[in-house]
Amino acid sequence: MAKQKIRIRLKAYEHRILDQSADKIVETAKRTGAGISGPIPLPTERTIYTVLRSPHKFKDSREQFEMRTHKRLIDIVNPTPKTVDSLMKLDLPSGVDIEIKL
């Protein structure tokens, strides 16, 4: 008999709300009797934008802006139907992107 697994990948710009969402998912899965692996922190993706400070000249004067994308991975092993239902009803913050693979 093959083991069933749900892989949940979370992304957010703020690590605090990301960790809170991961804790909610882990708590829900444990409460319904499923096995948990994670949350596993994945590498943080940094995107840097460099722009000129002045509108026309002075190319040596530049400003850099950075955007960080934090990621977490959670594996739910042998989920029950109750686990899937409770994960669907879970209310998570709007700043968290959720990717689910079965």
UniProtKB/Swiss-Prot annotation:
GO terms for biological process: translation. This is Small ribosomal subunit protein uS10. Involved in the binding of tRNA to the ribosomes. Part of the 30S ribosomal subunit. Pfam families: Ribosomal_S10 (PF00338). GO terms for cellular component: ribonucleoprotein complex; ribosome. Belongs to the universal ribosomal protein uS10 family. One of its GO terms (molecular function) is tRNA binding. PROSITE patterns: RIBOSOMAL_S10. The lineage of its organism: Bacteria, Bacillati, Bacillota, Bacilli, Lactobacillales. Keywords: Ribonucleoprotein, Ribosomal protein.
